[in-house]
Amino acid sequence: MNNNDQIVWCDIPVKDLDRAIKFYGAVLDQPIKKESHEGMSFGLLPHPHDGVGGCLVISKEAQPSANGPLVYLNCINRLDAAIAAVEKNGGKILQPKHQIGPYGSRAVILDSEGNRIALHSK
């Protein structure tokens, strides 16, 4: 992460942490590490040590929602495989894969918890 990054972290709210870890592990084709810190369990999304990251978290303050900010997850070189894993793992395709100008392609999905998420590839 450099000092010019505007987004540095995201928490994706979930209802069932184990179900969400399974869903995101399948869609991203990477292990989601379950951790616990100060009595709070969360699923750590893969990210470089010095890069933008995020986690799956159960929270009283935030509930899964299809309304609100749209988080884009990196599916570079495997967007089609990620999309194919969505419905098999309890999600739903809201917008099929489409071009977003010079910024690549995306599909907008509903994850296993009810969050609207974009899967993105350049």
Predicted regions and their residues:
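Short, charged/polar, Gly/Pro-enriched secondary-structure boundary elements
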Residues: D50-G54, N115-I117
